[in-house]
Structures are given as C-alpha cells and as structure tokens.
Amino acid sequence: MAKFPDKRARVCLFFRTLFRMRYKVTLVNVECLNQPGSKLVWPTHMAVIDPMLVFAELYKYPLQPFVDERFFANGVFRSILKVFDSISVPNLRKSRNGLEQAKQLNNLCLASLQAGKTVIFYPSGHCTSDGKESLGGRNMAHTMAQIMPDETRVIGVKIRGLWGSCTSRYGRKGTPPIFPTMFTNLWKLFVPRRKVTMEFEDITDMVRSWKGLEKTEFNHNLEEYYNSKGIDEPKTR
C-alpha cells in the first residue's frame, strides 16, 4: 500500500472522525485498491458530500482528485486541495477554449497514471438529480479508456445510502451548497447515524472491452453498470 504525507493523513482523519458522528460507512471490497500500479477510480455521485466521505474513508490511499475550479477560488478550500495534489477542472461548457482545455485535462490525467498515481474523478461530473447515475455527453471516462496505460486498473465505486439526504438533490431543483447545508443540519448529529455503503470493484476488463465503442454507447454501458442494483430508496433522515 502506498504511503502519503502526514499532513494528508491528518486532514483525512479529521474529517473521518467528524463524518462518523453522522454516517455509518461500510466499505465493500476496498482491497482492490491495494493492487500495484496506477489506478483510475470512478465513483457514482449521489450527493455533494460523497467526495469528502470517499477521501475521509480512504485515508490510507493517496488519491489525486480532479476538482471543480470553483473550489480553488476559496482560500481555505485551495489550501486543503493542494495537500491532495488536486487538479483544477474548468467549466468546459462556459469556456471558449473548452476543447483545448479538455485535451489538457486528459493529458494531465494520463501523465499522473504514467507516474503510477491513483487518480479519482466522477464520470458523470455532477450530482444525480433522480437517483440514477447519468453521464450524458461527458467525455473524460471514454477518452481515458482509450489512452490509459496498459497497466492501469479501473476501479468502479457504487455509493449507496446518500440519496434523499440533505446533501443530495432529492426534492431540489439544484445542487445544495455543501457547508451551509451541513451547518443547518447539525441537529442530525443527535439522530441515528445514516448507513452508507461504498462498494469497490475492479472493472478494468469490462472497460477495456468497451474501448472501441462510440462515446454514447460507452457512457450508456457505464450507466448500466452503475445503476444495475436500481435506485436507492430515498431516505430524508
């Protein structure tokens, strides 16, 4: 298992201690992250809290995340993100140079994999609005499947138990702001902990078998994998 700086460990363990007051997290088959070599980690995105939960629970693993550029605008966030060697992701839809920036992101991801790192990004790029994982026209997962090094393993992560929570889009038109939402729901620390499951699976062979597919079909197959167990029953407490 790879080692990482003490500062990263302290940040992760701080949030893990905090989150475990509210969430009872079960990790299934997390051992697949112990495989040698570079890895791509592709989780589902059920709520705005799940990236923080993933990092808190995987404190033993040196994950390098791709993070929305908006979070780098905040000084506190930026200092934390630097600890994790985070890569800023611009809003490609609003950028005049979207295509070129997408290529740069792909190249950065490839360089990290070639250096043996474990890169994590969310193929859908957004929180689900209906409990299902939907990639739409997203490009990055499809592109990385074409160009990732031969030794890279792809790890799928299905997260269950967060749909319907205050940090999900259940019953909302948009994505809730993470910290204001957490602060206004502090009273939930005094109710039974919410059960969350993170199921890890090595899907490398499956992803490689889709390598020659067009983006639309590739994304559809990945959606079917993510949604194979159906939609979580929404729980609001």
Regions found by a protein language model. Give the residues of each.
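Alpha-helical membrane-targeting segments
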Residues: 1-22, 73-85, 165-194
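Helix-to-loop junction immediately C-terminal to a conserved catalytic motif
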Residues: 13-45
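Catalytic core of membrane glycerolipid acyltransferases/transacylases, capturing the structured
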Residues: 34-100
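Residue-level preference for the first positions of well-ordered beta-strands
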Residues: 38-40, 116-120, 153
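Short, well-ordered beta-to-alpha junction loops that form the rim of enzyme active sites
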Residues: 44, 122-126, 159
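Short, charged beta->alpha transition segments
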Residues: 75-77, 105-113
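Catalytic-site beta-strand/loop segments enriched in glycine and acidic/polar residues
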Residues: 110-142
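A cross-family acyltransferase "interaction/gating" segment
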Residues: 129-212
